[in-house]
């Protein structure tokens, strides 16, 4: 991204468990309005890296910065505008979309005891609907719908909406299209593109390479805890990406 300051930046980040080096000297930058995909084989370090990016796990060494300020915890990262959606989504299925969106705020501030008690239902629905409209998410038309009645794709979108209710700098997604059918995958990818178009920085982990190539601006390939390639997604194929992931043709992969 030309002449832009990064929204989220990692500087020489390492993570070590005893003698095992999960991450080694990772440097990356994410910019407003772009979609970055972290790709790598199982055990490459993707989940560890994303947990460090969202503040859920401290690095052994190195810095994690949001708009130039170092973060030191999950709560601090959230306050700085970093939203995270894990693969299991962690939605309360007996609650509505709106209640889940506000529950995310309350669990971060007052804990379960204060959850949802500070706002009446009508106001909650109104504000949740306004946020959905602002984000341009057309697939969640009724925020009063219980999560248990949503499709798999709609649940993923509801989790994204919850993360973005209070975090507006960057969104991190762990396997957002896992176990979804083609129609639901399309719904989620369109939501991701809509969010990025509004200026959000988005980073995702995915094994679904065709979906990644359909939505990502940049690819970062991890191997054994190191980013070995950073390159535009445009022009890449499933075959070329897999070759980079396993280490074939390293001399030409980044050309």
What is the predicted function of each stretch?
Residues 2-255:
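Glycine-rich phosphate-binding loops of nucleotide-dependent enzymes
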């Amino acid at each position: 991204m030309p002449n832009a300051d990064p929204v989220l930046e990692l500087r020489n980040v390492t993570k070590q468990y005893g003698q095992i080096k999960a991450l080694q000297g990772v440097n990356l930058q994410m910019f407003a309005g772009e979609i970055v995909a972290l790709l790598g084989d199982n055990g490459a370090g993707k989940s560890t890296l994303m947990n460090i990016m969202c503040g859920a796990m401290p690095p052994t060494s190195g810095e994690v910065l949001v708009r130039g300020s170092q973060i030191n915890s999950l709560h601090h990262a959230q306050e700085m505008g970093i939203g995270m959606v894990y693969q299991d989504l962690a939605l309360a299925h007996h609650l509505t979309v709106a209640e889940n969106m506000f529950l995310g705020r309350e669990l971060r501030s007052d804990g379960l005891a204060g959850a949802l008690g500070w706002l009446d239902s009508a106001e909650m629905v109104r504000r949740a609907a306004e946020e959905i409209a602002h984000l341009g998410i057309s697939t969640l038309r009724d925020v009063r719908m219980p999560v248990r009645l949503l499709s798999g794709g709609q649940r993923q979108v509801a989790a994204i909406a919850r993360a973005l209710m209070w975090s507006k700098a960057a969104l991190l997604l762990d396997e957002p299209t896992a176990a979804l059918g083609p129609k639901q995958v399309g719904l989620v990818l369109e939501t991701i593109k809509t969010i990025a178009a509004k200026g959000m920085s988005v980073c995702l982990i995915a094994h679904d390479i065709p979906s990644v190539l359909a939505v990502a601006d940049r690819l970062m390939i991890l191997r054994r805890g190191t980013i070995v390639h950073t390159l535009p997604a445009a022009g890449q194929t499933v075959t070329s990406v897999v070759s980079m992931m396993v280490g074939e043709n390293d001399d030409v992969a980044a050309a």
